[in-house]
Each structure stands twice: as structure tokens, then as C-alpha cells.
């Protein structure tokens, strides 16, 4: 799709010049790291988390995804040699548990994407409800040798999100966020993602900068590192100049609960496969209600289709608890 006319380009300032880095030293620092990541995302729209996963976990994800590597397809709108594999929840249990259910990412997505809605329910009754985010899509991203530059873009265009310029971040600005974990070395020369830190606060009416903009920064990572980004930040995949190095990322995207999912979770996985997932994941992927009572089946909680004995929402984890049996990071900022 092309646009015949658009507002002219306009230089927009940023308050940050580099991608912030959060170092996760041990599980005891999860709360601190979540707080640091949230603060960094407010300022820059993107941050790198060092040591999110240990090497054995990374290797296990790669091993589980390896049978699907040859099935990686190119997609319309992406550069040549840029391939993806979708539907990862059933392809890699380790990905589902350690990446989708990662405690730090859970805290980040809940902070930025939990929707609060208030209204008069009826005469004399004021109502306030909160809906946690939902899974948007799951992808393994492969940038093969010879892959070209992806165009700078914002991911929230798929959700038809639109923002005016802002001097500082306010909750409600974003419709989605993502975390991408490095499964290989991710260096500038082999196609790592590039960003314009601070562009999440820009006015959407103006065109994106050119690929040689001096404010562009590259998310260079080692296996087990990750970057988190808000869907409002301008970014793109890059040229892989190497002749023998394939850059691989495992990505998870989240969105507000009332939006249509980019990846159709209900057709991607058959119901018998969904029944093998833990309750928190079933709810997060969409078998739950977005307040007020959106997404019902026969006027009931959709999780009852998966498990007729499921507890009503609010009496179990409600989709908020990753890695069942583990402590949940609560982001209180």
C-alpha cells in the first residue's frame, strides 16, 4: 500500500543518544532489573538486558527450533534472505517457559500494556476494571548472509496506533511491546537490529528518518542477551555483511487485551495442543476475558472450552503468572 500525499519530513529531537543497558546479574536482582528496564523504556523506547538467559537455556531453545530452521520462510515486505518461523509455543517448550514466561518481560509488559477502563456502568454505579495484556505473536527471526536493510518503521502500525509528539512518556501511549533474545552473536556486521533511541516520543505525522541518520544505534548482543522495545520506537533489521554467520533471535510480542492479535493464536494451535500448555499460558495467548467481558464463548470464560474444570478468572493466576510455582515480579513504579 502506498500513500499519495504525506506530511513533509521534520527533524525531531531526542533526549537520549544511546540504547540503555540493564545488567541482570542473578535471579535475586529481577525486581531491580525490571524497574531499571521500565525506566529505560520510558526514556529511550528500547533497552538491552545483559545475561537474561544462561547459555544452557539458549542452547536448548536453539536445539528445539533446529528441526524448523529449514522451514524458515521469507515474508512479503521483508528483505531477501530475511526469514521467520512462527507458532513457537508448541515448537519449543523452553521458549514458551523461559522467554514468553520470563519474569522480567512479564513485569515490563504488565506495566506498559495493562489497560484500565473506567465508566458509569449504570445509574449510580461507577466501574473501574483492569485487563492485563495478551500474547500478540511468537517468532524466530533469521537474518542470513546477504540480507539487506529493512526499512525503518514502527511495529504499532499493525495495530493502527497513532501518537502526537511528547516531551516525556505517559502510560497509555503504547499498544504493544516486544522482547527479542539473541540465540547467536548479534553484531552490526551480521544484521543486528538498529534503533533510534527516543523516537517513541516523536510525532507520528512526520516521515521516518533516512537509513544514514546519525542517531541510529545498533543492538549488539551476545547469546542470552535480549532487547526490549516499545512498539512506538523506530527500528529495523540490518544488512548481514558476513558470508557465513546467520543471526537468530527468538521474539515474543505482547499487545493490549482488546486488540486483534497479529498471529492468530486460535488457529495456530489446535485445541489438544493448547490443553498441554499451563494455565497462565492458555490465558495469556487469549483464552481469557478482556474486561468488560470481551472474548466470551457461550457467555462464559473461553478457558472453559479448553478445560471444563478451570477455575473462574480471578481465582487462579488470571494469565498474570508465568513459570508456575515461581515468584512473579510486580512492577510498581
From Swiss-Prot:
<dbReference type="GO" id="GO:0009058">
    <property type="term" value="P:biosynthetic process"/>
</dbReference>
<keyword id="KW-0479">Metal-binding</keyword>
<comment type="function">
    <text>Dioxygenase; part of the gene cluster that mediates the biosynthesis of communesins, a prominent class of indole alkaloids with great potential as pharmaceuticals. Communesins are biosynthesized by the coupling of tryptamine and aurantioclavine, two building blocks derived from L-tryptophan. The L-tryptophan decarboxylase cnsB converts L-tryptophan to tryptamine, whereas the tryptophan dimethylallyltransferase cnsF converts L-tryptophan to 4-dimethylallyl tryptophan which is further transformed to aurantioclavine by the aurantioclavine synthase cnsA, probably aided by the catalase cnsD.</text>
</comment>
<comment type="subunit">
    <text>Homodimer.</text>
</comment>
<dbReference type="Pfam" id="PF05721">
    <property type="entry name" value="PhyH"/>
</dbReference>
<feature type="binding site">
    <location>
        <position position="153"/>
    </location>
    <ligand>
        <name>Fe cation</name>
    </ligand>
</feature>
<comment type="pathway">
    <text>Alkaloid biosynthesis.</text>
</comment>
<feature type="region of interest" description="Disordered">
    <location>
        <begin position="309"/>
        <end position="333"/>
    </location>
</feature>
<comment type="similarity">
    <text>Belongs to the PhyH family.</text>
</comment>
<dbReference type="GO" id="GO:0051213">
    <property type="term" value="F:dioxygenase activity"/>
</dbReference>
<keyword id="KW-0408">Iron</keyword>
<dbReference type="InterPro" id="IPR008775">
    <property type="entry name" value="Phytyl_CoA_dOase-like"/>
</dbReference>
<dbReference type="GO" id="GO:0046872">
    <property type="term" value="F:metal ion binding"/>
</dbReference>
<feature type="compositionally biased region" description="Basic and acidic residues">
    <location>
        <begin position="323"/>
        <end position="333"/>
    </location>
</feature>
<keyword id="KW-0560">Oxidoreductase</keyword>
<feature type="binding site">
    <location>
        <position position="155"/>
    </location>
    <ligand>
        <name>Fe cation</name>
    </ligand>
</feature>
<keyword id="KW-0223">Dioxygenase</keyword>
<protein>
    <recommendedName>
        <fullName>Dioxygenase cnsJ</fullName>
        <ecNumber>1.14.11.-</ecNumber>
    </recommendedName>
</protein>
<feature type="binding site">
    <location>
        <position position="235"/>
    </location>
    <ligand>
        <name>Fe cation</name>
    </ligand>
</feature>
Amino acid at each position: 500500500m502506498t500513500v499519495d500525499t504525506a506530511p513533509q519530513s521534520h527533524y525531531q529531537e531526542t533526549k537520549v543518544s544511546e540504547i540503555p543497558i540493564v545488567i541482570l546479574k542473578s535471579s535475586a536482582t529481577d525486581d531491580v532489573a525490571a524497574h531499571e528496564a521500565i525506566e529505560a523504556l520510558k526514556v529511550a523506547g528500547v533497552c538491552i538486558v545483559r545475561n537474561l538467559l544462561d547459555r544452557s537455556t539458549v542452547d536448548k531453545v536453539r536445539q528445539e527450533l533446529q528441526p524448523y530452521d529449514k522451514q524458515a520462510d521469507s515474508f512479503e515486505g521483508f528483505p531477501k534472505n530475511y526469514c521467520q518461523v512462527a507458532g513457537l509455543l508448541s515448537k519449543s517448550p523452553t521458549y514458551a517457559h523461559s522467554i514468553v514466561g520470563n519474569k522480567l518481560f512479564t513485569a515490563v509488559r504488565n506495566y506498559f500494556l495493562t489497560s484500565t477502563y473506567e465508566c458509569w456502568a449504570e445509574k449510580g454505579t461507577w466501574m473501574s476494571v483492569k485487563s492485563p495484556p495478551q500474547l500478540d505473536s511468537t517468532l524466530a527471526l533469521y537474518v542470513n548472509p546477504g540480507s539487506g536493510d529493512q526499512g525503518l518503521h514502527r511495529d504499532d502500525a499493525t495495530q493502527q496506533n497513532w501518537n502526537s509528539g511528547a516531551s516525556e512518556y505517559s502510560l497509555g501511549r503504547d499498544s504493544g511491546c516486544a522482547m527479542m533474545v539473541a540465540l547467536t552473536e548479534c553484531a552490526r556486521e551480521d544484521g543486528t537490529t538498529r534503533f533510534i533511541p527516543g523516537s517513541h516520543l516523536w510525532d507520528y505525522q512526520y516521515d521516518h528518518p533516512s537509513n544514514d541518520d546519525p542517531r541510529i544505534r545498533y543492538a549488539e548482543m551476545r547469546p542470552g542477551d535480549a532487547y526490549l522495545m516499545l512498539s512506538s520506537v523506530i527500528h529495523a533489521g540490518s544488512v548481514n555483511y558476513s558470508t557465513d554467520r546467520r543471526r537468530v533471535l527468538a521474539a515474543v510480542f505482547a499487545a493490549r487485551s482488546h486488540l486483534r492479535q497479529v498471529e492468530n493464536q486460535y488457529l495456530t494451535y489446535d485445541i489438544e495442543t493448547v490443553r498441554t500448555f499451563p494455565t497462565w499460558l492458555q490465558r495469556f495467548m487469549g483464552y481469557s476475558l478482556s474486561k468488560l467481558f470481551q472474548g466470551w464463548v457461550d457467555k462464559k470464560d473461553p478457558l472453559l472450552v479448553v478445560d471444563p474444570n478451570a477455575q473462574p478468572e480471578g481465582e487462579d493466576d488470571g494469565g498474570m503468572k508465568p513459570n508456575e510455582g515461581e515468584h512473579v515480579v510486580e512492577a510498581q513504579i
